Amino acid sequence: MRRSPRSGSAASSHNHTPNFYSENSNSSHSATSGDSNGRRSAGPELGEPEGRRARGSSCGEPALSPGMPGGDTWAGSSRPKLAPRSHNGQTACGAATVRGGASEPSGSSVVLEEQLNLLPILDLRQEMPTPRVSKSFLSLLFQVLSMVLSLAVDGLVCVCREICSIRFLFTAVSLLSIFLAALWWGLLYLIPPLENEPTEMLTLSQYHHRVHSQGQQLQQLQAELNKLHKEVSSVRAAHSERVAKLVFQRLNEDFVRKPDYALSSVGASIDLEKTSSDYEDQNTAYFWNRLSFWNYARPPSVILEPDVFPGNCWAFEGDKGQVVIRLPGHVQLSDITLQHPPPTVAHTGGASSAPRDFAVYGLQADDETEVFLGKFIFDVQKSEIQTFHLQNDPPSAFPKVKIQILSNWGHPRFTCLYRVRAHGVRTSEWADDNATGVTGGPH
C-alpha cells in the first residue's frame, strides 16, 4: 500500500512518473513492499539494471557491475559512470542502499525520491542500442549513393543524347551543303551563261528579217554543197576511170608470151552460124544499157580484142553456150587461154557470170568433124588469166576451134566471155590463106 506523502514534499513528483518500460504494468516507482514498521522491502526494483544490485560500503563510491569483466564499468555502458548525486552535493550512499535492507538515513526523504525517480531515466539512456543507429546511417548513406549514381547516369544519358543530336545535325548540314554546292557548280558549267544572249527584245519585223536572211544563207550553203558534191563525184569518177585504165593496162599485158591466133588483128573471126545468140534483156532499161558504160549487149567478136575491162564482154543467155572462132589458117593447137577480170575490180562486187566448166573442140574444114581437145575448169578466184594445155596428140591442124561453156559461177541469167586466146603452130600459111580467102594483116 502506498504511503502518504510527507509534509513539505511535492506530491506531483510521485504521481506523474512516466512508464519507460513496456514490460512492466506497474508505476515508475520501485516495487517496494512495506512491512509493519513502514519500511520498504529490499527486493529488486522493476526496471533496475543488474549492475546496481550491490553498492560499495563507503560513501561516494559508485556502484559497479559485478557481472562485467573488470568490474569498473556500468552495465550497458562502455565508459565508467558515477552514481548520481543529490542536490546538496551528497552521494546516494549517504543513506542506506536501496537494496541493502537497512533503515533509511536521517537525510531528507525528498532527495531520496528524486534520486529514485532519476535512476530509470539514466538507465534508459545508457541502454539505447547503437546498432540501430548505425543501420539507419548506412541505409541513409546507401540511399544518398544510389541517388548520386542515378543522377550521374541521367546526366550521362542526357550528354549522349545531346552529342547524338549534334552529330545528326552536323551530318544533315554537311549533306545539304554538298548538295547545294553540286547544284551550284552544275548551274555554272552545264547551263550556258546568260550574258551571251541578247538582252534587248526584238520586234516582229526584225525577227522576220533575221529569219529571211538566215533562210537565204541556208539556200546558198545548199547550192555550194550541191556544187561540191558534183565536183567530188566527177573527181571520183575520174579517179575510178584512171584506176580502171591502170588495171586494164596491167591486165592487157601479155604474160603468156605465146602467139595468139584468136586475135582479130591477125585475121581471126567469129562463125556466127555456129555461135550462141546474144543475151537480150527483157527489161525496159535494155536500150539505156546499150548506151551505158556497163553494156551487156556486146557482139561475140569482142572476145577477139585485147581490151579487157568490166562490161566489155560477150554475154549469152543462161549458163550454157558456145562460140566458134575461125582461125587465120590451119593451126596445130597446143593451148587455150581464157581471161576474165578479177572480182576485186568488178562493178557488181563479184564474178558469178564468169565461165566455170568448158570444153575445147577442133573443127575440120568440112565443119562436120569435131575433135575433142579437153575439158577444163576456169577458177575465177585463182587468176584473171589462165592457160590450159590441150590434148592434141598427135598434133593436128584445125581451121576452126569451138569453145563450149558448160556452166558458170552462179549467175542465173547470162554468162560473160571477155577474151579467148588460141596458141599453137600455124602450117601452110599461103595455102590456108588461099583456101579460106582470108587476108591476114601484118604480123
From Swiss-Prot:
Isoform 1 is testis specific and is exclusively expressed in spermatids. Pfam families: Sad1_UNC. Residues 203-244 form a coiled coil. Residues 1-107 are annotated as: Disordered. Gene3D superfamilies: Galactose-binding domain-like. Disruption phenotype: Male infertility with severe defects in sperm head formation and globozoospermia-like phenotype. Its main location: membrane. One of its GO terms (biological process) is spermatogenesis. It is found in: Membrane; Cytoplasm, Cytoskeleton. Keywords: Cell projection, Cilium, Coiled coil, Cytoplasm, Cytoskeleton, Differentiation, Flagellum, Membrane, Nucleus, Spermatogenesis, Transmembrane, Transmembrane helix. It is a multi-pass membrane protein. GO terms for cellular component: cytoplasm; cytoskeleton; motile cilium; nuclear inner membrane. The keyword Ion transport does not apply. Involved in spermatogenesis. Required for sperm head formation but not required to establish and maintain general polarity of the sperm head. Required for anchoring and organization of the manchette. Required for targeting of SUN3 and probably SYNE1 through a probable SUN1:SYNE3 LINC complex to the nuclear envelope and involved in accurate posterior sperm head localization of the complex. May anchor SUN3 the nuclear envelope. Involved in maintenance of the nuclear envelope integrity. May assist the organization and assembly of outer dense fibers (ODFs), a specific structure of the sperm tail. This is Sperm-associated antigen 4 protein. It comes from Mus musculus. The lineage of its organism: Eukaryota, Metazoa, Chordata, Craniata, Vertebrata.
